[in-house]
UniProtKB/Swiss-Prot annotation:
It is found in: Secreted. It comes from the Eukaryota. InterPro entries: Defensin_beta-like. Its main location: secreted. GO terms for biological process: defense response to bacterium. This is Ostricacin-3. SUPFAM superfamilies: Defensin-like (SSF57392). Has antibacterial activity against the Gram-positive bacterium S.aureus 1056 MRSA (MIC=2.78 ug/ml) and the Gram-negative bacterium E.coli O157:H7 (MIC=2.41 ug/ml). Does not have antifungal activity against the yeast C.albicans 3153A. GO terms for cellular component: extracellular region. It comes from Struthio camelus (Common ostrich). Keywords: Antibiotic, Antimicrobial, Defensin, Disulfide bond, Secreted.
């Protein structure tokens, strides 16, 4: 059974601890409380 995708990952984002750094920008929060970042 595939586990449900994090909404962040579904939006092509990645979960980072702390702030997003270039070339990523913040698009939300992951389920685990980390920052959801996506490439520009």
């Amino acid at each position: 059974i595939p586990r449900p995708l994090d909404p962040c990952i579904a939006q092509n984002g990645r979960c980072f601890t702390g702030i997003c750094r270039y070339p990523y920008f913040w698009i939300g929060t992951c389920r685990n409380g980390k920052s959801c970042c996506r490439r520009r």
